[in-house]
């Protein structure tokens, strides 16, 4: 269910502006996805110029990018993020759907722990309402049970299949992902609460009320929301 689109220039603008908010001595949550990757690369350039920071990656991808950029890494056990910079698959009225890269459980953990959470996105991610499928990470044995529970909530669950191998997508945590289509989500907070209560569900991709700022890259600059 990976969401793509937007121009690379828009992503770079949003990513750079978020990276510019990082100050010397900060601990930074490093998000996952193409726009968050732009921030990681920008932070790497600033580290090369002398910026003293530590990063907490949210996925294998962001960890590898940070290592390539020579950003020193730490963990939530050792430090609390001053700021987290992460992307989104869809943005509506300040709320997000994430998880196209199957990293939303770790992303939410780091993003929610940060003193300040900056979302970076391009214009294609903006929507009047949240309406794309919501990823739910589940314990492998719980997948059929959660699928039935999601259907009972009015959703259409689909076990996410891997693109380059046979079988399902397996997360960095060793779990599976069910993409749950609900159509237009009129009350994201209520749905988030229902999904969180499902036995066997590890984490869902609704990020409700977590973002402090949303930086949207445009052709002319960055729109801050």
Curated annotation (Swiss-Prot):
It catalyses: aldehydo-D-ribose 5-phosphate = D-ribulose 5-phosphate. Substrate binds at residues 32-35, 86-89, 98-101, 125. It is an enzyme of class 5 (isomerase). It comes from the Archaea. It holds the Pfam family Rib_5-P_isom_A. Keywords: Isomerase. Residues 1-20 are annotated as: Disordered. The keyword Isomerase applies. GO terms for molecular function: ribose-5-phosphate isomerase activity. InterPro entries: NagB/RpiA_transferase-like, Ribose5P_isomerase_typA_subgr, Ribose5P_isomerase_type_A. One of its GO terms (biological process) is D-ribose metabolic process. GO terms for cellular component: cytosol. Its EC number is 5.3.1.6. Catalyzes the reversible conversion of ribose-5-phosphate to ribulose 5-phosphate. Belongs to the ribose 5-phosphate isomerase family. HAMAP family: Rib_5P_isom_A. This is Ribose-5-phosphate isomerase A.
